[in-house]
């Protein structure tokens, strides 16, 4: 549904951005929290879906669905990378070739509608080595996205870099407070507990949304 006269931010991404059903609490995507840091007059439509890559999101018709609704002055926030590195043919893209080809479809599609695309690098996974150093698990995808954003003159928000800095500052133990690390029996959805280093809890999702909002301000995006 298009809401005439209301500026809208559409979110296209994976599980780190997606909304979750109440029974999955406390796991949260940061897209569920971004409304806390932008003007109330701006509408957020979160179309991010767990497990999707820049390729599979398009192949399933999800970008087309957004482009049927988006209008001049709206924004399309695009965050993929976690699943683009998967080996299955449905999702895999190569960071310096097909990844760019699919991301350009988001860029070109939004611009054709008079809307503004924004590229957002995939969130850093919380993986520390035995020496307490953070491990890069995304390979070239974040750098590749930044290069494409520069080439296409698209605003770029480096949430990979920002979240990595935060994890390094907090360290191995304290950074768990942002992720879905739960004891057995703590929540019905996770009876055996969980140690998830990719997906954030409510506190972490809100912190990431704050990072995104800070970047929006620094980029002087015309939101609100």
Named regions from a protein language model:
Residues 19, 54-55, 86, 128:
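Glycine/Thr-rich phosphate-binding loops of Rossmann-like dinucleotide-binding domains
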Residues 19, 29, 42, 55, ...:
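Sparse, context-dependent recognition of short Cys/His-centered cofactor- or disulfide-binding micro-motifs
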Residues 4, 61-206, 210-224:
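Alpha-helical cap/lid subdomain in secreted, periplasmic
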Residues 13-15, 51, 84, 123-124:
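Short, histidine-centered active-site or binding-site loop motifs used for metal coordination
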Residues 53-61:
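Structural motif
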Residues 1-49, 63-76:
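Serine-esterase "nucleophile elbow" of acetyl-processing enzymes
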Residues 14, 47-52, 91-92, 128:
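Short, basic, glycine/proline-bearing loop/turn elements
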């Amino acid at each position: 549904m298009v809401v005439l006269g209301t500026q809208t931010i559409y979110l296209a991404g994976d599980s780190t951005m997606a909304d979750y059903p109440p029974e999955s609490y406390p796991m949260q995507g940061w897209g569920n929290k971004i409304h806390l840091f932008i003007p109330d007059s701006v509408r957020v439509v979160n179309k991010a879906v767990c497990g999707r890559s820049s390729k599979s999101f398009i192949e399933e018709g999800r970008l087309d669905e957004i482009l049927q609704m988006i209008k001049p002055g709206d924004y399309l926030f695009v965050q993929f990378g976690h699943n683009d590195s998967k080996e299955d043919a449905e999702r895999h893209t190569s960071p310096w070739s097909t990844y760019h080809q699919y991301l350009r479809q988001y860029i070109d599609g939004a611009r054709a509608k008079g809307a503004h695309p924004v590229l957002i690098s995939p969130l850093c996974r919380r993986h520390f080595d035995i020496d307490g150093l953070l491990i890069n698990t995304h390979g070239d995808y974040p750098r590749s996205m930044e290069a494409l954003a520069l080439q296409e003159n698209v605003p770029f928000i480096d949430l990979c870099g920002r979240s990595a800095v935060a994890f390094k500052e907090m360290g191995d133990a304290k950074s768990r407070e942002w992720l879905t690390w739960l004891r057995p029996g703590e929540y019905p959805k996770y009876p055996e507990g969980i140690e998830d280093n990719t997906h954030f809890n409510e506190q972490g999702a809100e912190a990431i949304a704050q990072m995104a909002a800070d970047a929006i301000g620094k980029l002087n995006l015309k939101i609100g």
